[in-house]
Structures are given as structure tokens and as C-alpha cells.
Amino acid sequence: MIDNVITAIDRVAAEHPTRVAYDYEGTQYTYAQLKEGSDRLAGFFAETLPEHEPIIVYGGQTFDMVEVFLGLSKSGHAYIPIDTHSPNERITQVQDVAHTPAIIEVAPLPIAVPDVQIIRAPELHEAEKTHALISSLQHAVVGDDNYYIIFTSGTTGKPKGVQISHDNLLSYVNWNISDFGLKEGVVAMSQPPYSFDLSVMDLYPTLVLGGTLKALPKEVTDNFKTLFATLPKLGLNEWVSTPSFAEIALLDPNFNQDNYPDLTHFLFCGEELVNKTAQELITRFPKATVYNTYGPTETTVAVTGMAITQDIVDQYPRLPIGFAKPDTEIFVVDEQGNQVSAGTEGELMIVGPSVSKGYLNNPEKTAKAFFNVGSQRGYRSGDLATMTEDGMIFYRGRTDFQVKLHGYRIELEDVDHNLNQVSYIKQASTVPRYNKDHKVAQLIAFAVAKPNDFESDMKLTQAVKAELGKMVMEYMIPQRIIYRDKLPLTANGKVDRKALIAEVNH
């Protein structure tokens, strides 16, 4: 149990200065380098930036990004990460909401951002080597101060900045370390971009434990041949990703325990872990434990979790997302806000110390999504779920991924789940096609098919629909199935449903 994230990382540097904190494709950086560099940057930021203002940090999957994050935290600033693979308009959209006084260029900005101080990479590199160390941590981020702000997409196209405090992060890190049994010195894959809160799942627990982050930049993950050649060389103990990324790795027949002898932990979050993916991982990695977790960005990475064992896979065609972490209460409520009985579907309400204070500079959206229960903060998740008597939770989809077709309410993720069970289908995502009156006219599925002997897509579709028809009501069967070699992913590694919706409704 730690009581401060910043001092816990500094303690590792004091006790194990030569230990490797970060490994970027073979270039290694020690905890001593992380501490000295972040201390010098903190001194520089304390002199250069207005007090306590959040600061945008633009860059990729590099050690410099982590050093800047820590330097900002030590000097009392929240950081707002923007990944280099974000569209250019993302930078201006975030700045329009955040009004930050400065942007730190770890990588060069692709566009000009007027009326804001730009701290460029040469200045950073000079400061991290020569600037005086920060004299003390008395102004460092602590308690309810914002530690980071991650922007998620908003329904109006205007992104929402989720404010995560030091205490929110502390609650998450302590739970992650204790519940998932991670050991000191853990070697963890660092694949999600820092603008995606899943990255926090590997970043801070690993550093607090004196472990090593093995960066996996997008240039590697985008090329399957390079990816499959790189992964076995990393010597991983811990794998953190979306299930979609693991499904890519599973395309490589060599992705198994023999070639990854030290891999003991799979931690999944960000989207639904399907039964057959879990089964394949359990089969291929008998010495590893597969953890399924769940949590909106607004509740700091994840608030539920459990080990997915062979018994769980056998018992539940649709896997549970686990139990609430010990310091958190989760309720399932109906549309009137009343708690429902065990097994009844409703919306998840999350109350506890890792729930955000709200959206940056957006009191209206904050008031709609957040509430107080005594001294605790609560969040309306917009996620549908059921809960058993003993508190095990099953995710059932999004309230905003519900569509009505011919009067029937359909969960798109429910259709996906069942399509993914069809023997001919490797991966599928279902989207609505709207008519000119903006009503749903059709369900269309995009699918990656397994190798098969059908003479045409039409014959394959007939077989898929016949098998699917044994699992779901007729009205849930997509009218069309479009086959692709792969489905588009967002920058965060999730299936890009919005891109598919746009494609069928252009």
C-alpha cells in the first residue's frame, strides 16, 4: 500500500537507481535517469509555467513523455496527453476546452496553435540535463489536485476532459497492485497510447513496483510481421491491452507459453473480452492468469475485475467483468434511478474514491453525469449490466448502443457477442443503417471470416445466419454481412464502430 504515487516512484530511484524503468526498442533508461530528469524538468516548469495550470503534452510512446509527466506532477501541474497519431483537429479541440497556457512538444506539433506558449524539445532536453533540480516537492500534485486529464470523445463532437486527481490515481494503483498480484520488478508491456487511460494500467503500477515498461510504439504494432518478431523478445511478465490487440497477437501461432515463458498476467480493459478469446489464451498460456476488468475513464481506468478461469469460461458464454474493487460501491438501477433486483438489467452507477470530480470546464455535462453520495463521488456510467446476489457483474452494452428496429430494442453489442460465437466468424461488429427519417432501416454486420470452403460470400452468409438464428431472436439477425480482412480500430485499439456506422450511412 502506498500513500503517494510521486514519492513511491522516487523511492524506487533511491533504492534501485540502476534498475531499468523504460525500454524503448532496446534503448534503456534507469530510475536514476527518470528521477534526475524529472526533478530538473520540475525545476524548469516551476520557473516557466503559471502555477497549477494543466498543460498539454504532445508526443508518442517514449521515455521523454513519462519524464515530462513526472516533472509536471512534481511542479504541481496536471498533464493532458495528446498522442502523435491523433488527427490535427484533436489538438485545437482539446485546447479550445482546456485553455492551457502552454503546450509541451515532446514531438513536433503538426499545426500552429496560436496564443499559447510552446515549449519545444530542444528546451526540454537542455533543461533535463542542466537545469537546477527542484528544491522540494512542497508544490507537487497531491490529494484532490488533478494528476492528469484525459479527453474522451463527446456526443456533440466536442471532447470532454476527464479530471483524475492524485487520490483517484492512488486508489486505482493500490487496488491494481494488490488484487492482480503483481510482483516487484515486473516487466510490463506498454502499448496503449498515453492519451488512452488504459495506458495508466501499465504505467503507474509498474513504476511504483520498480518494474520495467517495454514500449511498443504504433510503428511496431501496425506491422504484424514486425510485431510478431518483436513481442517474444520483450521478456514480458505482464500484458496490458484491449482484447482486440490480443486477438491480433493470437493470429501468430507462436504466441504461446513456450515462446513467452515469463508471461504470467494478462490484464484486459477498454472493451468486451469475448469467451473464445479468453479460452484461446487459457489454452495457449497455462501458467498465466487472464484478468477481465471494466471501468470508464471517469472512474480511473478500472473499478471491477476478476480472474477468468477455465471454470468461468465453461460456465458463462458471455464473461463477467468481475466484482467491484473493495473501496467502491456499484449499483444497477432502472430508468427512474431505483436499484433493481439481482439479475435484472439496468444502468451501472459507480461510487467511490477513484471517481473523477468531473469534466474540465464543462459544468453542464459534469452535473448530468456525476453526483455525490455523502462524501463520496458517484458516476452514471451509461453502461448496461446485471449483477448476481454476490456482486458479480455482467456487462450488457451501452445505453447509447441501443437501437430500435421494427419496434424491437436491440443491443448492438449483444448481436456482436453472438456473431463472435458463430463458428465461421473470427470477429464482428454490427451497425445500424438509417433511412431518410433517421430511423433504423437495417442492421449490417462487418465481419472477419475464418478460413472456409464456401464458394461465395452469399453461401457463407447463409451459413452464418443459420447458425446465428439458433442463438438469437430473428429480429436480431443482421440483414447484410460485409466481409473484411480486418476491422478498423480506433487509436485506442478498440473496434471503430463509428467509422463503420459512417461507412454504411454516407
UniProtKB/Swiss-Prot annotation:
Protein EC: 6.2.1.54
Residue numbers binding D-alanine: D197, V301, K494
Keywords of the record: ATP-binding, Cytoplasm, Ligase, Nucleotide-binding
Catalytic activity, reaction form: holo-[D-alanyl-carrier protein] + D-alanine + ATP = D-alanyl-[D-alanyl-carrier protein] + AMP + diphosphate
GO biological process, one term: lipoteichoic acid biosynthetic process
Cited Gene3D superfamilies: 3.30.300.30, N-terminal domain of ligase-like
PROSITE patterns: AMP_BINDING
Pfam families assigned: AMP-binding (PF00501), AMP-binding_C (PF13193)
Listed GO CC annotations: cytoplasm
Localization per Swiss-Prot or TrEMBL: Cytoplasm
Binding site for ATP: T152, S153, N292, T293, Y294, G295, P296, T297, D383, Y395, R396, G397, R398, K494
Pathway assigned to this chain's UniProt record: Cell wall biogenesis; lipoteichoic acid biosynthesis
Highest taxon of the lineage: Bacteria
Molecular-function GO terms, alphabetical: ATP binding; D-alanine [D-alanyl carrier protein] ligase activity
InterPro entries hit by this protein: AA_adenyl_dom, AMP-bd_C, AMP-bd_C_sf, AMP-binding_CS, AMP-dep_synth/lig_dom, ANL_N_sf, DltA, DltA-like
HAMAP family: DltA
Task of the protein: Catalyzes the first step in the D-alanylation of lipoteichoic acid (LTA), the activation of D-alanine and its transfer onto the D-alanyl carrier protein (Dcp) DltC. In an ATP-dependent two-step reaction, forms a high energy D-alanyl-AMP intermediate, followed by transfer of the D-alanyl residue as a thiol ester to the phosphopantheinyl prosthetic group of the Dcp. D-alanylation of LTA plays an important role in modulating the properties of the cell wall in Gram-positive bacteria, influencing the net charge of the cell wall.
Family membership noted in the UniProt record: Belongs to the ATP-dependent AMP-binding enzyme family. DltA subfamily.
Name of this protein: D-alanine--D-alanyl carrier protein ligase
Organism of derivation: Lacticaseibacillus casei (strain BL23) (Lactobacillus casei)
Lineage, uppermost ranks: Bacteria, Bacillati, Bacillota, Bacilli, Lactobacillales
Record gene name: dltA
